[in-house]
Amino acid sequence: MEPRTRILLLLGLGWYSAQASLLEVLRTELERNAAVLKTQPQPAYFLAYQVTDLQNTVLEAQAGKLRSVSQQRTRWLDVDVRVGSYELDNTHPLQEASDWGFRSYPVRLPLRDDERALRQLLWQATMSAYDEAAESYAKVLAGRSVRVQETEGVPDFSRETARRDIQLKAHLQLDTALWAQRLRMLSALFAPHPWIYSHRVRLQVSSTQKFLVNTEGTELAWSEQFVFLSISAQTRADDGMELPLYRTYFAFRAEELPPMEQVRTDILQLIELLRQLRQAPVLETYAGPAILSGEAAGVFFHEILGHRLEGHRQKDPNSAQMLRDLLGKPILPPFLDVVFDPTQRFRDGVPLAGSYLYDDEGVPGQRVVAVEAGVLRNFLLNRTPIPGFAHSNGHGRRQPGLKPVARQSNLLVFARERVSPEELRERLRQECRRQGKEFGLLFASVEGGFTFTARTVPNAFNVMPLVVYKIYVDGRPDELVRGVDFIGTPLTAFANIVAAGSDVGVFNGLCGAESGNIPVSASSPSLLVSRIEVQKKAKSDERPPILPAPLVEPFR
């Protein structure tokens, strides 16, 4: 099949020509090296080069002063070699392989397109990658002769349409003097509060250009850009419990971040909330009804559903494969749909961090309806086929130095039946009365979470709330509480979702897993859960500092 071709010129001719020369070197060396490797006793049937040109600018401020400014540009080469065939190759999962070959051993490249240096580094990296692939393939052949195969007949690599496309953007430029002034102003807001023991205002501007060629004929160059403005502050209660709060703003360009006056107002509200948390009572162990805000519900789905939908886990013999046999069966209430869509850049005007044009295997990002009317329909797939799914749907992602695996993008939860926030609270009270509870809980904000998917440990999750309120049945004002984590097991948690609100919250952040840290988003309406469990959060025995904090000069 002829490669699909598209070229979009977004840059000056000189800059474009320089980048084209990099692609030319990659293509030339790919063809030269592949011609040799396919004639070896253990032939390589696939070879790919990916270059990631990353420019990162980070500014940090504290107490009205600029703490650090750094700008770094690096180029990384990842070489992917496959020995064997599409049906069986060196990446075949082995029961005893703890990392399933996730490392890629990246090579740092010069920033300038020095053809001789590039060719030398490509040659060295290709030989190293081939030697490792050939060794792994020998282990695969030996292992198959003595072990039961769980995924017999499922190929190790999918055949995909080759594509040629150039859609590059110049690296983002930042007015560092302007943003240094802004960060100093924002961080100075914490100075009058000595009970805030640490704080930070951080701006990260990340601009990435990716170049990918492979022996199937794919030749791609595209850009990914994002900006995070992060606010963090921490205090400590009298009993020693550490109390952090965070506020993060995401945009595709720095000028698209919220106005500084809005950020200033948000910081003042965060400071007041920290003050209230220091005095808030500790919530005892609780099991009962709760509302998850849209942001909290997004993290909830990311942890307990999203990671279990990642396709390679359905083939990994060390994974619990909890959802593998539930395809076509209900796993959520019939009023909920769950979609993953890297092509959607905004939801209700809010930018989404998990957006991209192509994944790291050269497959276009695609909208995936994972759950439809509560029924499991699909998994997130890279080019590792699983039973019933022969092709990638554009979710093979990685950070440089690691092998691409199926990862999340923009997780979107949709509710077919919605009620107003007021009605959702009233339904919470009704559920509390039915269960004989004095109050229910509202999880307003969360820090993040983690989950376990291996067979050797309980398949549980832990979502770490930052802001939790008691909602009383008798109508008393909501009460702020602290000191708990939201825990549970996936299928039970799914079954307890009983209603959804009409609002939508968005969580943007970085997700870490086998293939590294990647930007993702999770968005959802608020959810009413008939029964959740919380456990006490780990607590330090340290008391608040004896010495008063030094006075900080006001910002000028």
For each feature predicted by the language model, list its residue ranges.
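Sec-dependent signal peptide recognition
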Residues: 2-10
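Active-site bordering "gate/hinge" segments
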Residues: 11, 15-358, 363-367, 372-375, ...
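Short clusters of small/polar residues that mark proteolytic maturation junctions
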Residues: 245-247, 381, 482-483
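Short gly/pro-enriched beta-turn/loop segments at secondary-structure junctions
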Residues: 285, 363-365, 404-408, 436-438, ...
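Conserved active-site beta-strand-loop modules that form the wall/rim of enzyme catalytic pockets
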Residues: 367-368, 377-378, 409-410, 439-440, ...
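C-terminal, non-catalytic macromolecule-binding modules
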Residues: 377-431
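Hydrophobic alpha-helical bundle architecture
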Residues: 414-492, 508-514
